[in-house]
Amino acid sequence: MAFDHIIITLVHGTWARHTRWVQDDSRLCQQLRTRFGDRLHLTRFPWSGWNQASARLSAAKRLRVHLQKLILDHPEAEHFIIAHSHGGNVAMYALQDDTLEAKISGLVCFSTPFLHVYSREASRGGGETLRLGMLNAWPLFLIALLIASGQVKNSAAPLVIGLLAILGCLLFILWETWSKQLAEQLQFPSMKHTRLLLLRATGDEASAALGGAGCFSWLSAFPIRLVNAISARPLRLIAQHATTIRARAGVVGIRIALLACAFVVLDAISHVQSALRIHQWLGPPIAPVWFTYLTAPLAIYVGLLFASLLPTLLVPILLFLLGFMLLPFGWEVAIAAPFIETFAEATPPGTWNIIQLSRRECLWPRDEESETGGLRHSAVYDSQRAILEVAVFLAERLNAALREKLGSQLSQLSGKTRVKP
């Protein structure tokens, strides 16, 4: 029993729409045709090749449709993917569809820098502090400033500051939400290690550059980690005390606290009315309450200002670090860097078989290239050793698929599940 078709989809990497290795006259294609004959069919999947997360995700959606159509048109064929560089990430994102992933017999990745993307744990406390502080401190400070000055004209400054704080808070929330959604989209599917072949070259320039960029990814979150370090203990103490107060005071204590807050609000309103020269309605002009309400928002505002000032002073450094991430990771990952961790690794998460080619093995016999000529990142798909490894991998996967199909047929004939000895 033999397969009628072996269909291999070739996926190029970044900035390589017209690369030669996916063409019929390339060494890889010629060698595979020689070994597998007429039953081998090669298809090329072109995509933009832009070094952007959105470009790779968009290409993954199109590749998913491309593979689904091939499987629908050739259900009895064995389907493989061979990808180079970020084309491997495109293929992995396409296989996030579990149904499609189960129908792909194997994936070969040449020099793929697998991007591991995770949401930053450090952004939670710092982000929460900035959001709550900006939303809650500005109206209190506005009222306190009105009370202290007694002049209407001075109310414009805190009002503008408050509106800017709300706008900044909303932008911060949108920024963080978008970044975490991007991280979720850039996750890898679950695959059996026997269905993935990884080939890499010693001295891969792209991997070295991406590895260095991972350090800038870590440093870019320093402002938020700093805010988180400052605010973590106060937030924890507030949460602990709030639990204690609720447990000890109960419903009666909470009602008393709410009543006290109501008195504070009425006192503040009376002073605002006085500052605006509006006829006052009854309010409790209690000096201690007024003083408490005046100092509390000022303390909150000063604390917020201190917490916001440190990361603000570090903005130039942050922009400098993000600039170093633009070229290796693309602008989306660079912008999301304060909220996500991005590292380029030799493999996806898990246990895999990886073949590391030496510098000499990256050259075809009788090649006239010098030892320093050409990019090692682009030499793998022309390596005789790499092409032989791909051929062996394809043969092993075909044999495994054949055994599986024969076992399924035997089970149907015997009416029971075939048990391996």
Predicted regions and their residues:
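Hydrophobic helix-cap positions at the C-terminus of alpha-helices
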Residues: R35, L70, D98, F343-A346, ...
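A short, Lys/Arg-enriched amphipathic alpha-helix followed by its capping loop at the start of a domain
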Residues: D24-L40
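Extreme N-terminal starter segment of soluble prokaryotic enzymes
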Residues: A2-I8
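Serine-dependent carboxylesterase/thioesterase catalytic core
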Residues: I8-T19, Q23-L28, W47-R225, A239-I256, ...
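Short amphipathic alpha-helices and their capping/turn segments at secondary-structure boundaries
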Residues: M1-A2, T99
